[in-house]
Amino acid sequence: MTTRYKMTMAYDGHLFHGFQLQPDQRTVQGTVEDALKKMTKGKRIIVQGSGRTDAGVHAIGQVIHFDYPGKTIPANRMILALNSMMPTDIIFNNCEIVNENFHARYSIKGKWYRYRVSLDHFVNPFKRFYTGHFSYALDVGKMQEAAKDLLGKHDFTSFAASGGQIEDKVRTIYYVNIAKDEKENEIVFDFIGSGFLYNMVRIMVAALLEIGNGRRPVHDLKRVIAAKDRQEVRQTAQASGLYLYHVFYDEYHKNIDRTGIYN
């Protein structure tokens, strides 16, 4: 007998070699599985994540599930137990007991990624692991206009890094917002879509920054999408600025205001 738990977690990705388990590397999955192994006196419990964030990528709303053997532990006790065993760069924020049909990855209806770009002239030592960096002039209005060309259902081959294992490159982008955070002197990009290819968000950010800086025409993304060629966007924004912000398991929720608040 097992009980399936769905848990939402946040982590600072700076000191992790990504989410996915890797031999002899510190990973998010490995850290959680080690804790569960201690709780079950040596049994390996496989943790399934909503996505495999890369080294240096952060999460505000990563979702996992696992099947815990034996007597059911109430959700409020499970979250307390796991949080007591986590390092300071991981925290669980929610725990639910779900039926066996739920899957953290395959039940997804959409994902929300946020990317932060520091505009400081020099790299801020206190931001270097938590933002990308771009010190050149940017026209936010041009980037906002260009982002409209990403909306809808497209083949995003031009925005997929090599190394991805998924052959179907068609995805739907529901929402893009680009805004200046005056207080932090940052540009904040929000993307919500049915799913995202390997490094897709970071490549889209790199292309939009080139448009904002005048290196590309405003509507160049139409041509890039049609080309279906990764060589059309050779740059990839740094991992440090990317956050997995929210995972949707019901239909896409449109109640998102311009500050990027999900209600």
Curated annotation (Swiss-Prot):
Catalytic residue positions: D54
EC number: 5.4.99.12
A Pfam family reported for this protein in Swiss-Prot or TrEMBL: PseudoU_synth_1
InterPro entries, sorted: PsdUridine_synth_cat_dom_sf, PsdUridine_synth_TruA, PsdUridine_synth_TruA_a/b_dom, PsdUridine_synth_TruA_C, TruA/RsuA/RluB/E/F_N
Keyword Calcium assigned: no
GO molecular function, one term: tRNA pseudouridine(38-40) synthase activity
Keywords from the UniProt entry: Isomerase, tRNA processing
Binding, substrate: Y113
Protein name per the record: tRNA pseudouridine synthase A
